[in-house]
From Swiss-Prot:
SMART domains: TGFB (SM00204). Proteolytic processing yields a number of bioactive forms. The 20/23 kDa forms consist solely of the mature alpha chain, the 26/29 kDa forms consist of the most N-terminal propeptide linked through a disulfide bond to the mature alpha chain, the 50/53 kDa forms encompass the entire proprotein. Each type can be furthermore either mono- or diglycosylated, causing the mass difference. Originally found in ovary (granulosa cells) and testis (Sertoli cells), but widely distributed in many tissues including brain and placenta. In adrenal cortex expression is limited to the zona reticularis and the innermost zona fasciculata in the normal gland, extending centripetally into the zona fasciculata in hyperplasia. Also found in adrenocortical tumors. Also expressed in prostate epithelium of benign prostatic hyperplasia, in regions of basal cell hyperplasia and in nonmalignant regions of high grade prostate cancer. Dimeric, linked by one or more disulfide bonds. Activin B is a dimer of alpha and beta-B. Inhibin A is a dimer of alpha and beta-A. Inhibin B is a dimer of alpha and beta-B. Interacts with TGFBR3L; this interaction regulates female fertility. It comes from Homo sapiens. This is Inhibin alpha chain.
């Protein structure tokens, strides 16, 4: 609340018309913003004459991580995720009813596992997938196997019968095998049910929980389809010709007085402009908003109160005592903080600090 009043008083011009007039001078706004930062963070550490916290430039490994070129939009972070799927079959080596069938399959070196990819996984693009299988074999046993026949083979059930799944063996810890599915086989994880048949003549069926096989799928958001890209690239239709459209284009510009009502003013401020680029190293700049304008609109006596939770409009005073004159100011409770990264030793160490209640979100006549 103290910062609310301070911001309100600092950004109020002197004189009787406290909420009206032209936009504030940039130098005045910078001075008030500098006072708000010093009130919240305190003065920067002085390491030499002149009040500059060091002259050594920020190392590139720190500077490149947070700075962006002015005028460039920050790149959107790619939506990637990883899913781990375990077999959904109820049969195991400990089930007496299924022990005979599983034992027969194990004797033949064939292991059957059913996976059920989630709706989230099926709705995304699978970029890679690996099947982790506990072979129980050490590297010596693997090397001693018959080299004329592959140690592991992978099949997938389809309506037409089992089909071979292209894969390659990757690096794995002892007693395990990691099968990397080829790109052409990644579409298998888009089906609701995936049944894999793994052929390993030297492997045995294990009922230990830590030996349960599993699938690891890496996914990302699907790229837009061709039709969606075409819709995005289709130019907007031209404005239909009509006399009303012509009159709208030929109308004179609005007077400055039309924007004199209470509104939020935006100002891009860089810390280099404030002289603190060696103290506050990130962000390099921020958008500062303050409230400005008049509240001279006629207010009917039967005006209903604003809806709770919704910011009032300039024509609806937030709170007005009898005989008091409304003034354009930030709506209490809607101010947001600004998080900054500071250094006091020229970039050897950093500190993350917060300037509370600095960014104005809503303005109202109060």
């Amino acid at each position: 609340m103290v910062l609310h009043l301070l911001l309100f008083l600092l950004l109020t011009p002197q004189g009787g018309h406290s909420c009206q007039g032209l936009e504030l001078a940039r130098e005045l706004v910078l001075a008030k913003v500098r006072a708000l930062f010093l009130d919240a963070l305190g003065p920067p550490a002085v390491t030499r004459e002149g009040g500059d916290p060091g002259v050594r430039r920020l190392p590139r490994r720190h500077a490149l991580g947070g700075f962006t070129h002015r005028g460039s939009e920050p790149e959107e972070e790619e939506d990637v995720s990883q899913a781990i799927l375990f077999p959904a079959t109820d049969a195991s080596c400990e089930d007496k009813s299924a022990a005979r069938g599983l034992a027969q399959e194990a004797e033949e070196g064939l292991f059957r596992y059913m996976f059920r990819p989630s709706q989230h996984t099926r709705s995304r693009q699978v970029t890679s997938a690996q099947l982790w299988f506990h072979t129980g074999l050490d590297r010596q046993g693997t090397a001693a196997s018959n080299s004329s026949e592959p140690l592991l083979g992978l099949l997938a059930l389809s309506p037409g019968g089992p089909v071979a799944v292209p894969m390659s063996l990757g690096h794995a810890p002892p007693h395990w095998a990691v099968l990397h599915l080829a790109t052409s086989a990644l579409s298998l994880l888009t089906h609701p049910v995936l049944v894999l048949l793994l052929r390993c003549p030297l492997c045995t069926c294990s009922a230990r929980p830590e030996a349960t096989p599993f699938l690891v799928a890496h996914t990302r958001t699907r790229p837009p389809s061709g039709g969606e890209r075409a819709r995005r690239s289709t130019p907007l239709m031209s404005w239909p010709w009509s006399p009303s459209a012509l009159r709208l284009l030929q109308r004179p510009p609005e007077e400055p007085a039309a924007h004199a009502n209470c509104h939020r003013v935006a100002l891009n401020i860089s810390f280099q402009e404030l002289g603190w680029e060696r103290w506050i190293v990130y962000p390099p700049s921020f958008i500062f908003h303050y409230c400005h304008g008049g509240c001279g609109l006629h207010i009917p006596p039967n005006l209903s109160l604003p809806v709770p939770g919704a910011p009032p409009t300039p024509a609806q005073p937030y709170s007005l005592l009898p005989g008091a004159q409304p003034c354009c100011a930030a709506l209490p409770g809607t101010m947001r903080p600004l998080h900054v990264r500071t250094t006091s030793d020229g970039g050897y160490s950093f500190k993350y600090e917060t300037v509370p209640n600095l960014l104005t979100q809503h303005c109202a006549c109060i």
